[in-house]
Amino acid sequence: MIVKRKGLSRVIYATYYSIKGLRSAFASEAAVRQEIFAMLILVPFAVYVDVTNVERILLIMSLCVVLITELLNTAVEKLCDHVSTDIHLLIGRAKDIGSAAVFVSLLLAAFVWLTILL
């Protein structure tokens, strides 16, 4: 029987599983590690560069969008691999679409950074 947690207990368990998911993605996906490493460099840069607060928020949020998209893509890929390791047209499409979402988020981040900094 599944126990439905409520209140603070639910928040604590949700936080635990979120951190567990981040650790799992970090351990298993090079792209996640690369994006977190890039954020460790670019977020402090965004804090110290001479831009408005709104621009600073946009710079940082664009990096967060990339990481969020990569985490969702990783989840899709892991689920697809669990469903079948065989080559399948629809699984291939799902993985390609997830990859395309990451690519679009990277283009968005590049556009935001170049527009603000140039």
Could you say what each language-model-derived stretch is?
Residues 1-75, 83, 87-95, 99-118:
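Hydrophobic alpha-helical transmembrane segments
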